[in-house]
Swiss-Prot record:
The N-terminus may be important in determining the rate of inactivation of the channel while the tail may play a role in modulation of channel activity and/or targeting of the channel to specific subcellular compartments. It is a multi-pass membrane protein. GO terms for biological process: protein homooligomerization. Glycans are attached at N224. SUPFAM superfamilies: POZ domain, Voltage-gated potassium channels. The chain crosses the membrane at residues 176-196, 242-262, 274-294, 309-328, 345-365, 406-426. InterPro entries: BTB/POZ_dom, Ion_trans_dom, K_chnl_volt-dep_Kv, K_chnl_volt-dep_Kv1, KCNA7_BTB_POZ, SKP1/BTB/POZ_sf, T1-type_BTB, VG_K_chnl. A lipid is attached at C264 (S-palmitoyl cysteine). GO terms for molecular function: voltage-gated potassium channel activity. It catalyses: K(+)(in) = K(+)(out). Keywords: Glycoprotein, Ion channel, Ion transport, Lipoprotein, Membrane, Palmitate, Potassium, Potassium channel, Potassium transport, Transmembrane, Transmembrane helix, Transport, Voltage-gated channel. This is Potassium voltage-gated channel subfamily A member 7. Heterotetramer of potassium channel proteins. It comes from Mus musculus.
Length: 489
């Protein structure tokens, strides 16, 4: 019979007509599908599996249900046969083998024992070669991210460029380029903010501010090309220091985007990537603004239309901050959390919309008799309802009647309850993605397929294996640092 550890949670043993696993419907269905053969038969032979001193016993036909695995293939498992003891010996993790054997007995149900760490169990599953499908199901059940396959270009030069600009962890030069890219992004954002200061702002694009400039000080006298200081030459747009810095940043962004576009393995996949679209949007405002400025200097186009375009384009420049998400795991986790919580966020907005309509209507009718009321209509009350339900409370609009104050109190309480309902789900999603990312980093997992070759094996004469007997195991789960590769396309 089979010797089991006392704390095991999986039914294991001989595939006979007794035992707890036979009473389960799954086990009976699996046994009903097995072919009946008269004894003596090799498939009914009992096999003894010794795992680090703990002996398991099962039938050969039980292991034969999965012939592509290490235990299911008689040729591959024969390498571990001990003729003197008439058993198969595996110097592996004993608590994990209980679940591995149950995988064969149950017809493909793989469950990690509660007392076995995930990384240890994944390594055992890889050793016994249970297959990529079983490993993917296990990762999904455990909440692990399935590493996607990241293709590489075929040409060697394009492959080096792609690794240099797309994978900062691939080499020291790639890390330096990533640092330079982050610094350029930060400089661009700082310039975008500083050029809106009154001391640096050039308002000559807006003729409507000319009277204000004459009355408020010299810094607004830049309008229509006039000098901010008496006697100083008119300020030209292309001589502006902010324009020069912005041009240098755009040159770097354009160079980076162009190199990645040329070296990418698939143009279609490249343009479907959201981060690449953000990179394109980050440089588009500069060229539109430059073309508008040149057209205005040549007298082409309407000034009002040019001014409207410039204002919209300048607003789009703020999206450059999302370029940092390419180099920030925290921003990526935040994006994954928001994407996974779209349903909860939609419910939150829907609940707030209902509350805003109800309480704005109630406070309007409660304050309608007041002559000096701020709640002149229900749409005017929307703003008050929003800031009250979100517990902001600016105080620019406040009820003064008893009924209005009661409505305001109920609105604040309802807002707290409404906002607090979906928050635990969003926090749970963030915790899930955060721990998944940190656990992947601690385990040394990479987001691409490893192709590290196997070590040199000794010959059969020394008790080893020849190359043809190497088991077709899954790729290593935790490749050594500096040895990660990706699949070529």
């Amino acid at each position: 019979m089979l010797f089991l550890p006392a704390d095991t949670g999986h039914p294991t043993g001989v595939a006979a007509a007794s035992g707890p696993h036979v009473r389960s419907p799954v086990a009976r269905a699996v046994r009903a599908m097995e072919p009946r053969c008269p004894p003596p038969c090799g498939c009914c032979e009992r096999l003894v599996l010794n795992v680090a001193g703990l002996r398991f016993e099962t039938r050969a036909r039980t292991l034969g249900r999965f012939p592509d695995t290490l235990l299911g293939d008689p040729v591959r498992r024969s390498r571990f046969y001990d003729g003197a003891r008439r058993e198969y010996f595996f110097d592996r993790h004993r608590p994990s083998f209980d679940a591995v054997l149950y995988y064969y007995q149950s017809g493909g149900r793989l469950r990690r024992p509660a007392h076995v760490p995930l990384d240890v169990f994944l390594e055992e599953v890889s050793f016994y070669g249970l297959g990529a499908a079983a490993l993917a199901r296990l990762r999904e059940d455990e909440g692990c991210a399935v590493p996607p396959e990241r293709p590489l270009p075929r040409r060697a030069f394009a492959r080096q460029l792609w690794l240099l600009f797309e994978f900062p962890e691939s080499s020291q030069a790639a890390r330096v380029l990533a640092v330079v890219s982050v610094l350029v992004i930060l400089v661009s954002i700082v310039v975008f903010c500083l050029e809106t200061l009154p001391d640096f702002r050039d308002d000559r694009d807006d003729p409507g501010l000319a009277p204000v400039a004459a009355a408020t000080g010299p810094f607004l006298a830049r309008l229509n090309g006039s000098s901010p200081m008496p006697g100083a030459p008119p300020r030209q747009p292309f001589n502006d220091p902010f324009f020069v810095v912005e041009t240098l940043c755009i040159c770097w962004f354009s160079f980076e985007l162009l190199v990645r576009l040329v070296a990418c393995p698939s143009k279609a996949v490249f343009f479907k990537n959201v981060m690449n679209l953000i990179d394109f949007v980050a440089i588009l405002p500069y060229f539109v603004a430059l073309g508008t400025e040149l057209a205005r200097q040549r007298g082409v186009g309407q000034p009002a239309m040019s001014l409207a375009i410039l204002r919209v384009i300048r607003l789009v420049r703020v999206f450059r901050i999302f370029k940092l998400s390419r180099h920030s795991k925290g921003l990526q986790i935040l994006g994954q959390t928001l994407r996974a919580s779209m349903r909860e966020l939609g419910l939150l907005i829907f609940f707030l919309f209902i509350g805003v309509v109800l309480f704005s209507s109630a406070v309007y009718f409660a304050e309608v008799d007041r002559v000096d009321t701020h709640f002149t209509s229900i749409p005017e009350s929307f703003w008050w309802a929003v800031v009250t339900m979100t517990t902001v409370g600016y105080g620019d609009m406040a009820p003064v009647t008893v009924g209005g104050k009661i409505v305001g109190s109920l609105c604040a309480i309802a807002g707290v309850l409404t906002i607090s309902l979906p928050v635990p789900v969003i926090v749970s999603n963030f915790s899930y993605f955060y721990h998944r990312e940190t656990e992947g980093e601690e385990a040394g997992m990479y987001s691409h397929v490893d192709t590290q070759p196997c070590g040199t094996l000794e010959g059969k004469a020394n008790g080893g294996l020849v190359d043809s007997e190497v088991p077709e195991l899954l790729p290593p789960l935790w490749p050594p640092a500096g040895k990660h590769m990706v699949t070529e396309v």
